[in-house]
Swiss-Prot record:
Originating species: Arabidopsis thaliana
SUPFAM superfamilies in the record: Winged helix' DNA-binding domain
Stated name of the protein: 26S proteasome non-ATPase regulatory subunit 12 homolog B
Encoding gene per record: RPN5B
Gene3D superfamilies: Winged helix-like DNA-binding domain superfamily/Winged helix DNA-binding domain
Domain of life: Eukaryota
SMART domains assigned: PINT
Role played: Acts as a regulatory subunit of the 26 proteasome which is involved in the ATP-dependent degradation of ubiquitinated proteins. Acts redundantly with RPN5A.
Length: 442
Protein backbone atom coordinates (compact mmCIF):
# COMPACT_ATOMS: atom_id res chain seq x y z
CA UNK A 1 0.00 0.00 0.00
CA UNK A 2 2.80 2.35 0.95
CA UNK A 3 4.57 1.67 -2.37
CA UNK A 4 1.31 2.25 -4.27
CA UNK A 5 0.76 5.62 -2.58
CA UNK A 6 4.34 6.61 -3.20
CA UNK A 7 3.97 5.69 -6.90
CA UNK A 8 0.76 7.73 -7.21
CA UNK A 9 2.31 10.80 -5.56
CA UNK A 10 5.40 10.57 -7.80
CA UNK A 11 3.22 10.28 -10.92
CA UNK A 12 1.04 13.23 -9.83
CA UNK A 13 4.14 15.36 -9.27
CA UNK A 14 5.49 14.42 -12.72
CA UNK A 15 2.10 15.04 -14.37
CA UNK A 16 2.07 18.60 -12.98
CA UNK A 17 5.61 19.10 -14.20
CA UNK A 18 4.67 17.68 -17.63
CA UNK A 19 1.70 20.08 -17.87
CA UNK A 20 3.84 23.12 -17.08
CA UNK A 21 6.48 22.11 -19.62
CA UNK A 22 3.85 21.27 -22.28
CA UNK A 23 2.09 24.62 -21.92
CA UNK A 24 5.46 26.36 -22.08
CA UNK A 25 6.25 24.27 -25.23
CA UNK A 26 9.45 23.05 -23.62
CA UNK A 27 10.23 19.96 -25.72
CA UNK A 28 13.07 18.56 -23.61
CA UNK A 29 11.21 19.06 -20.32
CA UNK A 30 7.92 17.54 -21.60
CA UNK A 31 9.76 14.57 -23.07
CA UNK A 32 11.68 13.96 -19.83
CA UNK A 33 8.58 14.17 -17.60
CA UNK A 34 6.53 11.84 -19.85
CA UNK A 35 9.25 9.20 -20.11
CA UNK A 36 9.87 9.36 -16.34
CA UNK A 37 6.19 8.55 -15.70
CA UNK A 38 6.43 5.48 -17.96
CA UNK A 39 9.67 4.44 -16.28
CA UNK A 40 8.06 4.55 -12.81
CA UNK A 41 5.13 2.39 -14.01
CA UNK A 42 7.51 -0.12 -15.59
CA UNK A 43 9.74 -0.36 -12.49
CA UNK A 44 6.62 -0.98 -10.38
CA UNK A 45 5.56 -3.69 -12.92
CA UNK A 46 2.13 -2.09 -13.04
CA UNK A 47 1.31 -2.83 -16.69
CA UNK A 48 -2.30 -1.67 -16.46
CA UNK A 49 -1.21 1.72 -15.12
CA UNK A 50 1.47 1.92 -17.82
CA UNK A 51 -1.16 1.46 -20.56
CA UNK A 52 -3.41 4.06 -18.93
CA UNK A 53 -0.63 6.64 -18.62
CA UNK A 54 0.46 6.13 -22.26
CA UNK A 55 -3.10 6.81 -23.46
CA UNK A 56 -3.63 9.75 -21.07
CA UNK A 57 -0.37 11.49 -21.92
CA UNK A 58 -0.91 11.06 -25.69
CA UNK A 59 -4.41 12.61 -25.45
CA UNK A 60 -3.31 15.72 -23.52
CA UNK A 61 -4.30 18.99 -25.17
CA UNK A 62 -1.48 20.38 -27.31
CA UNK A 63 0.75 17.38 -26.63
CA UNK A 64 4.10 17.78 -28.37
CA UNK A 65 4.99 15.36 -31.19
CA UNK A 66 8.47 14.78 -29.80
CA UNK A 67 7.04 13.73 -26.44
CA UNK A 68 4.65 11.21 -28.03
CA UNK A 69 7.47 9.82 -30.16
CA UNK A 70 9.76 9.41 -27.12
CA UNK A 71 6.97 7.73 -25.12
CA UNK A 72 6.24 5.21 -27.88
CA UNK A 73 9.94 4.45 -28.40
CA UNK A 74 10.53 3.97 -24.67
CA UNK A 75 7.43 1.80 -24.16
CA UNK A 76 8.53 -0.42 -27.09
CA UNK A 77 11.64 -1.34 -25.09
CA UNK A 78 9.39 -2.74 -22.34
CA UNK A 79 7.48 -5.13 -24.66
CA UNK A 80 10.02 -7.97 -24.44
CA UNK A 81 10.08 -7.69 -20.65
CA UNK A 82 6.35 -8.28 -20.15
CA UNK A 83 5.31 -11.19 -17.92
CA UNK A 84 2.91 -12.97 -20.31
CA UNK A 85 1.53 -12.90 -23.86
CA UNK A 86 -1.76 -11.20 -22.88
CA UNK A 87 0.10 -8.29 -21.24
CA UNK A 88 2.41 -8.02 -24.25
CA UNK A 89 -0.51 -7.94 -26.71
CA UNK A 90 -2.30 -5.33 -24.59
CA UNK A 91 0.77 -3.07 -24.51
CA UNK A 92 1.32 -3.43 -28.28
CA UNK A 93 -2.34 -2.59 -28.98
CA UNK A 94 -2.14 0.47 -26.70
CA UNK A 95 0.95 1.75 -28.52
CA UNK A 96 -0.69 1.00 -31.89
CA UNK A 97 -3.72 3.08 -30.91
CA UNK A 98 -1.45 5.97 -29.92
CA UNK A 99 0.58 5.72 -33.15
CA UNK A 100 -2.46 5.36 -35.47
CA UNK A 101 -2.76 8.27 -37.91
CA UNK A 102 0.41 10.00 -36.66
CA UNK A 103 3.00 10.30 -39.43
CA UNK A 104 5.85 11.05 -36.99
CA UNK A 105 5.50 7.57 -35.38
CA UNK A 106 4.61 5.61 -38.55
CA UNK A 107 7.83 3.56 -38.42
CA UNK A 108 7.17 2.60 -34.79
CA UNK A 109 3.61 1.61 -35.76
CA UNK A 110 4.93 -0.64 -38.54
CA UNK A 111 7.32 -2.35 -36.11
CA UNK A 112 4.56 -2.80 -33.52
CA UNK A 113 2.26 -4.32 -36.16
CA UNK A 114 5.01 -6.74 -37.16
CA UNK A 115 5.46 -7.80 -33.51
CA UNK A 116 1.71 -8.36 -33.11
CA UNK A 117 1.51 -10.32 -36.37
CA UNK A 118 4.36 -12.56 -35.21
CA UNK A 119 2.49 -13.34 -31.97
CA UNK A 120 -0.70 -14.11 -33.93
CA UNK A 121 1.24 -16.41 -36.27
CA UNK A 122 2.75 -18.28 -33.30
CA UNK A 123 -0.80 -18.76 -32.03
CA UNK A 124 -1.74 -20.32 -35.39
CA UNK A 125 -3.84 -17.34 -36.54
CA UNK A 126 -2.10 -16.89 -39.92
CA UNK A 127 -5.07 -15.17 -41.63
CA UNK A 128 -5.30 -12.63 -38.80
CA UNK A 129 -1.53 -12.03 -38.92
CA UNK A 130 -1.69 -11.47 -42.71
CA UNK A 131 -4.57 -8.99 -42.36
CA UNK A 132 -2.67 -7.04 -39.68
CA UNK A 133 0.45 -6.77 -41.86
CA UNK A 134 -1.49 -5.65 -44.92
CA UNK A 135 -2.97 -2.70 -43.03
CA UNK A 136 0.43 -0.97 -43.11
CA UNK A 137 1.64 0.43 -46.46
CA UNK A 138 5.37 0.78 -45.68
CA UNK A 139 6.22 1.65 -49.30
CA UNK A 140 4.92 5.18 -48.57
CA UNK A 141 7.17 5.67 -45.50
CA UNK A 142 9.88 8.10 -46.54
CA UNK A 143 11.91 7.92 -43.32
CA UNK A 144 12.08 4.10 -43.16
CA UNK A 145 15.31 2.39 -44.26
CA UNK A 146 15.13 0.62 -47.64
CA UNK A 147 16.10 -2.77 -46.22
CA UNK A 148 13.46 -2.52 -43.49
CA UNK A 149 10.78 -1.67 -46.07
CA UNK A 150 11.74 -4.66 -48.22
CA UNK A 151 11.85 -6.99 -45.20
CA UNK A 152 8.35 -5.83 -44.16
CA UNK A 153 6.86 -6.35 -47.64
CA UNK A 154 8.51 -9.79 -47.90
CA UNK A 155 6.88 -10.72 -44.59
CA UNK A 156 3.52 -9.63 -46.04
CA UNK A 157 4.13 -11.83 -49.12
CA UNK A 158 5.18 -14.82 -46.99
CA UNK A 159 2.04 -14.66 -44.85
CA UNK A 160 -0.15 -14.47 -47.99
CA UNK A 161 1.61 -17.53 -49.44
CA UNK A 162 1.20 -19.38 -46.13
CA UNK A 163 -2.56 -18.93 -46.33
CA UNK A 164 -2.62 -19.74 -50.11
CA UNK A 165 -3.67 -16.22 -51.10
CA UNK A 166 -1.63 -16.18 -54.32
CA UNK A 167 -3.40 -13.20 -55.94
CA UNK A 168 -2.60 -10.87 -53.03
CA UNK A 169 0.93 -12.29 -52.79
CA UNK A 170 1.56 -11.31 -56.41
CA UNK A 171 0.16 -7.79 -55.88
CA UNK A 172 2.40 -7.27 -52.82
CA UNK A 173 5.50 -8.71 -54.53
CA UNK A 174 5.16 -6.13 -57.32
CA UNK A 175 5.85 -3.39 -54.76
CA UNK A 176 9.49 -4.55 -54.81
CA UNK A 177 11.53 -3.74 -57.91
CA UNK A 178 14.09 -6.58 -58.38
CA UNK A 179 16.64 -3.99 -59.57
CA UNK A 180 16.86 -2.65 -56.01
CA UNK A 181 18.86 -5.78 -55.06
CA UNK A 182 21.55 -4.95 -57.62
CA UNK A 183 22.28 -1.55 -56.05
CA UNK A 184 25.94 -0.96 -55.18
CA UNK A 185 26.05 -0.94 -51.37
CA UNK A 186 29.76 0.00 -51.34
CA UNK A 187 29.05 3.53 -52.59
CA UNK A 188 29.08 6.22 -49.95
CA UNK A 189 25.67 7.62 -49.13
CA UNK A 190 25.16 11.33 -49.66
CA UNK A 191 24.71 13.26 -46.46
CA UNK A 192 21.21 14.78 -46.35
CA UNK A 193 21.03 18.56 -46.58
CA UNK A 194 19.61 20.57 -43.75
CA UNK A 195 15.82 20.43 -43.81
CA UNK A 196 15.68 17.11 -45.69
CA UNK A 197 14.03 14.06 -44.11
CA UNK A 198 16.48 11.85 -42.28
CA UNK A 199 16.17 8.15 -43.09
CA UNK A 200 16.32 6.04 -39.95
CA UNK A 201 18.82 3.22 -39.77
CA UNK A 202 17.34 -0.27 -39.95
CA UNK A 203 17.28 -2.30 -36.69
CA UNK A 204 20.05 -4.86 -36.15
CA UNK A 205 17.72 -7.82 -36.82
CA UNK A 206 16.95 -6.67 -40.39
CA UNK A 207 18.95 -8.75 -42.95
CA UNK A 208 21.31 -7.24 -45.52
CA UNK A 209 20.20 -6.49 -49.08
CA UNK A 210 21.76 -9.69 -50.49
CA UNK A 211 20.06 -11.85 -47.85
CA UNK A 212 16.76 -10.12 -48.66
CA UNK A 213 17.39 -10.81 -52.35
CA UNK A 214 17.57 -14.54 -51.65
CA UNK A 215 14.43 -14.43 -49.46
CA UNK A 216 12.59 -12.51 -52.21
CA UNK A 217 13.42 -15.04 -54.93
CA UNK A 218 12.67 -18.01 -52.66
CA UNK A 219 9.21 -16.53 -52.07
CA UNK A 220 8.76 -15.94 -55.82
CA UNK A 221 9.69 -19.60 -56.45
CA UNK A 222 6.89 -20.59 -54.05
CA UNK A 223 4.49 -18.34 -55.95
CA UNK A 224 5.48 -19.54 -59.44
CA UNK A 225 5.40 -23.19 -58.32
CA UNK A 226 1.67 -22.80 -57.67
CA UNK A 227 1.03 -22.36 -61.44
CA UNK A 228 4.01 -24.47 -62.61
CA UNK A 229 5.61 -21.45 -64.33
CA UNK A 230 8.88 -23.28 -64.93
CA UNK A 231 10.71 -20.55 -66.84
CA UNK A 232 10.01 -17.99 -64.08
CA UNK A 233 11.12 -20.50 -61.42
CA UNK A 234 14.31 -21.01 -63.42
CA UNK A 235 14.94 -17.24 -63.62
CA UNK A 236 14.44 -16.97 -59.86
CA UNK A 237 16.99 -19.73 -59.22
CA UNK A 238 19.36 -18.01 -61.67
CA UNK A 239 19.10 -14.80 -59.59
CA UNK A 240 19.90 -16.79 -56.41
CA UNK A 241 22.81 -18.47 -58.22
CA UNK A 242 24.29 -15.03 -59.07
CA UNK A 243 24.48 -13.99 -55.39
CA UNK A 244 28.23 -13.86 -54.47
CA UNK A 245 27.83 -15.82 -51.20
CA UNK A 246 26.10 -18.64 -53.12
CA UNK A 247 28.67 -18.73 -55.94
CA UNK A 248 31.55 -19.03 -53.47
CA UNK A 249 30.08 -22.05 -51.66
CA UNK A 250 29.86 -25.35 -53.66
CA UNK A 251 27.39 -26.75 -51.11
CA UNK A 252 24.99 -23.97 -52.13
CA UNK A 253 25.59 -23.37 -55.85
CA UNK A 254 25.59 -27.04 -56.94
CA UNK A 255 21.97 -27.71 -55.77
CA UNK A 256 20.86 -24.35 -57.23
CA UNK A 257 22.54 -25.05 -60.59
CA UNK A 258 20.90 -28.50 -60.64
CA UNK A 259 17.52 -26.82 -60.15
CA UNK A 260 18.27 -24.38 -63.01
CA UNK A 261 19.03 -27.33 -65.33
CA UNK A 262 15.88 -29.22 -64.34
CA UNK A 263 13.58 -26.22 -64.79
CA UNK A 264 15.18 -25.39 -68.16
CA UNK A 265 14.34 -28.94 -69.23
CA UNK A 266 10.77 -28.53 -67.89
CA UNK A 267 10.14 -25.08 -69.44
CA UNK A 268 8.28 -24.89 -72.78
CA UNK A 269 10.41 -24.04 -75.82
CA UNK A 270 10.49 -20.27 -76.44
CA UNK A 271 13.12 -17.52 -77.00
CA UNK A 272 13.55 -16.91 -73.24
CA UNK A 273 14.14 -20.62 -72.59
CA UNK A 274 16.64 -20.86 -75.48
CA UNK A 275 18.55 -17.81 -74.23
CA UNK A 276 18.80 -19.15 -70.65
CA UNK A 277 19.70 -22.61 -71.93
CA UNK A 278 22.63 -21.33 -74.00
CA UNK A 279 23.81 -19.03 -71.18
CA UNK A 280 23.78 -21.96 -68.71
CA UNK A 281 25.69 -24.21 -71.11
CA UNK A 282 28.44 -21.57 -71.31
CA UNK A 283 28.86 -21.63 -67.51
CA UNK A 284 32.19 -23.30 -66.68
CA UNK A 285 30.84 -24.61 -63.36
CA UNK A 286 28.37 -26.81 -65.24
CA UNK A 287 31.24 -29.19 -66.08
CA UNK A 288 31.38 -30.10 -62.36
CA UNK A 289 27.96 -31.78 -62.71
CA UNK A 290 28.50 -33.62 -66.06
CA UNK A 291 25.17 -35.48 -66.06
CA UNK A 292 23.27 -32.20 -66.13
CA UNK A 293 25.53 -30.75 -68.80
CA UNK A 294 24.73 -33.82 -70.91
CA UNK A 295 20.99 -33.32 -70.26
CA UNK A 296 21.09 -29.71 -71.51
CA UNK A 297 23.21 -30.68 -74.53
CA UNK A 298 20.63 -33.31 -75.47
CA UNK A 299 17.89 -30.68 -75.35
CA UNK A 300 19.92 -28.22 -77.45
CA UNK A 301 21.00 -30.83 -80.04
CA UNK A 302 18.44 -31.28 -82.83
CA UNK A 303 18.21 -35.05 -82.49
CA UNK A 304 15.35 -37.30 -81.39
CA UNK A 305 15.61 -38.19 -77.67
CA UNK A 306 14.42 -41.62 -76.52
CA UNK A 307 12.27 -40.94 -73.47
CA UNK A 308 12.73 -44.39 -71.89
CA UNK A 309 16.54 -44.28 -71.94
CA UNK A 310 16.57 -40.64 -70.72
CA UNK A 311 14.20 -41.41 -67.82
CA UNK A 312 16.13 -44.52 -66.78
CA UNK A 313 19.33 -42.45 -66.67
CA UNK A 314 17.95 -39.44 -64.75
CA UNK A 315 15.15 -40.99 -62.67
CA UNK A 316 17.27 -41.29 -59.49
CA UNK A 317 18.60 -37.72 -59.86
CA UNK A 318 15.05 -36.47 -60.48
CA UNK A 319 13.65 -38.11 -57.35
CA UNK A 320 16.68 -37.06 -55.28
CA UNK A 321 15.83 -33.36 -55.82
CA UNK A 322 13.35 -33.42 -52.92
CA UNK A 323 16.32 -33.84 -50.55
CA UNK A 324 18.13 -30.82 -52.06
CA UNK A 325 17.77 -27.06 -51.48
CA UNK A 326 14.36 -25.95 -52.73
CA UNK A 327 12.69 -29.33 -52.33
CA UNK A 328 10.94 -31.38 -55.01
CA UNK A 329 10.36 -30.14 -58.56
CA UNK A 330 6.56 -30.40 -58.24
CA UNK A 331 3.81 -32.98 -58.50
CA UNK A 332 3.45 -32.64 -62.28
CA UNK A 333 7.17 -32.36 -63.04
CA UNK A 334 7.55 -35.98 -64.24
CA UNK A 335 4.62 -35.69 -66.68
CA UNK A 336 5.77 -32.26 -67.88
CA UNK A 337 9.32 -33.50 -68.52
CA UNK A 338 7.95 -36.27 -70.76
CA UNK A 339 5.78 -33.71 -72.55
CA UNK A 340 8.80 -31.43 -73.16
CA UNK A 341 10.79 -34.34 -74.63
CA UNK A 342 7.86 -35.14 -76.98
CA UNK A 343 7.68 -31.46 -78.03
CA UNK A 344 11.45 -31.43 -78.60
CA UNK A 345 11.18 -34.54 -80.79
CA UNK A 346 8.32 -33.04 -82.86
CA UNK A 347 10.43 -29.89 -83.45
CA UNK A 348 13.35 -32.10 -84.58
CA UNK A 349 11.06 -34.01 -86.99
CA UNK A 350 9.67 -30.72 -88.38
CA UNK A 351 13.22 -29.58 -89.13
CA UNK A 352 14.25 -32.66 -91.10
CA UNK A 353 10.90 -33.53 -92.77
CA UNK A 354 8.64 -31.42 -94.97
CA UNK A 355 6.14 -34.31 -95.31
CA UNK A 356 5.71 -37.33 -93.03
CA UNK A 357 3.03 -39.94 -92.38
CA UNK A 358 1.29 -40.21 -89.02
CA UNK A 359 2.48 -43.79 -88.67
CA UNK A 360 6.15 -42.81 -89.10
CA UNK A 361 5.81 -39.82 -86.73
CA UNK A 362 4.27 -42.05 -84.06
CA UNK A 363 7.17 -44.52 -84.45
CA UNK A 364 9.77 -41.75 -84.01
CA UNK A 365 7.98 -40.39 -80.94
CA UNK A 366 7.33 -43.87 -79.45
CA UNK A 367 3.62 -42.96 -79.17
CA UNK A 368 0.30 -44.09 -80.62
CA UNK A 369 -1.01 -42.19 -83.67
CA UNK A 370 -3.77 -40.60 -81.53
CA UNK A 371 -1.24 -39.32 -78.97
CA UNK A 372 1.08 -38.06 -81.71
CA UNK A 373 -1.81 -36.17 -83.36
CA UNK A 374 -2.87 -34.67 -80.00
CA UNK A 375 0.63 -33.36 -79.16
CA UNK A 376 1.19 -32.06 -82.71
CA UNK A 377 -2.16 -30.23 -82.68
CA UNK A 378 -1.33 -28.59 -79.33
CA UNK A 379 2.00 -27.34 -80.70
CA UNK A 380 0.35 -25.93 -83.83
CA UNK A 381 -2.27 -24.13 -81.70
CA UNK A 382 0.47 -22.66 -79.45
CA UNK A 383 2.31 -21.54 -82.65
CA UNK A 384 5.45 -23.49 -81.75
CA UNK A 385 5.50 -24.74 -85.37
CA UNK A 386 3.46 -24.57 -88.60
CA UNK A 387 1.92 -27.79 -89.92
CA UNK A 388 -1.08 -28.95 -91.95
CA UNK A 389 -2.66 -32.36 -91.38
CA UNK A 390 -4.30 -34.33 -94.20
CA UNK A 391 -6.33 -36.82 -92.15
CA UNK A 392 -7.77 -38.98 -95.02
CA UNK A 393 -4.28 -39.71 -96.40
CA UNK A 394 -2.61 -39.56 -92.96
CA UNK A 395 0.09 -37.10 -94.07
CA UNK A 396 1.51 -34.10 -92.20
CA UNK A 397 3.08 -31.18 -94.08
CA UNK A 398 5.52 -29.03 -92.11
CA UNK A 399 6.37 -25.45 -93.04
CA UNK A 400 9.32 -23.33 -91.95
CA UNK A 401 8.43 -20.76 -89.29
CA UNK A 402 9.19 -17.33 -90.72
CA UNK A 403 9.91 -14.30 -88.60
CA UNK A 404 8.18 -10.96 -89.15
CA UNK A 405 11.07 -9.51 -91.21
CA UNK A 406 11.03 -12.42 -93.66
CA UNK A 407 7.25 -12.16 -94.08
CA UNK A 408 7.48 -8.39 -94.66
CA UNK A 409 10.30 -8.78 -97.21
CA UNK A 410 8.37 -11.52 -99.04
CA UNK A 411 5.25 -9.33 -99.15
CA UNK A 412 7.24 -6.34 -100.47
CA UNK A 413 8.86 -8.51 -103.19
CA UNK A 414 5.50 -9.95 -104.29
CA UNK A 415 3.95 -6.47 -104.36
CA UNK A 416 6.82 -5.21 -106.54
CA UNK A 417 6.32 -8.13 -108.97
CA UNK A 418 2.58 -7.41 -109.13
CA UNK A 419 3.16 -3.71 -109.91
CA UNK A 420 5.70 -4.64 -112.64
CA UNK A 421 3.13 -6.99 -114.18
CA UNK A 422 0.43 -4.30 -114.08
CA UNK A 423 2.82 -1.81 -115.72
CA UNK A 424 3.72 -4.27 -118.49
CA UNK A 425 0.03 -5.02 -119.07
CA UNK A 426 -0.69 -1.29 -119.36
CA UNK A 427 2.10 -0.93 -121.94
CA UNK A 428 0.74 -3.86 -123.96
CA UNK A 429 -2.82 -2.47 -123.90
CA UNK A 430 -1.55 0.97 -124.95
CA UNK A 431 0.49 -0.58 -127.78
CA UNK A 432 -2.49 -2.58 -129.09
CA UNK A 433 -4.69 0.52 -128.93
CA UNK A 434 -2.19 2.56 -131.00
CA UNK A 435 -1.84 -0.23 -133.63
CA UNK A 436 -5.61 -0.54 -134.08
CA UNK A 437 -6.02 3.27 -134.36
CA UNK A 438 -3.47 3.39 -137.24
CA UNK A 439 -5.24 0.50 -139.02
CA UNK A 440 -8.61 2.27 -138.81
CA UNK A 441 -7.25 5.53 -140.29
CA UNK A 442 -5.73 3.66 -143.22
Amino acid sequence: MEESRQLESSIDRLLNEEKQMRLAENVAGTRKAATEILKLCFEAKDWKLLNEQILNLSKKRGQLKQAVQSMVQQAMQYIDQTLDIETRIELIKTLNNVAAGKIYVEIERARLTKMLAKIKEEQGLIAEAADLMQEVAVETFGAMAKTEKIAFILEQVRLCLDQKDFVRAQILSRKINPRVFDADTTKEKKKPKEGENMVEEAPADIPTLLVLKRIYYELMIRYYSHNNEYIEICRSYKAIYDIPSVKENPEQWIPVLRKICWFLALAPHDPMQSSLLNATLEDKKLSEIPDFKMLLKQIVTMEVIQWTSLWNKYKDEFENEKNMIGGSLGDKAGEDLKLRIIEHNILVVSKYYSRITFKRLAELLCLTTEEAEKHLSEMVVSKALIAKIDRPSGIICFQIVKDSNEILNSWATNLEKLLDLVEKSCHQIHKETMVHKVALRA
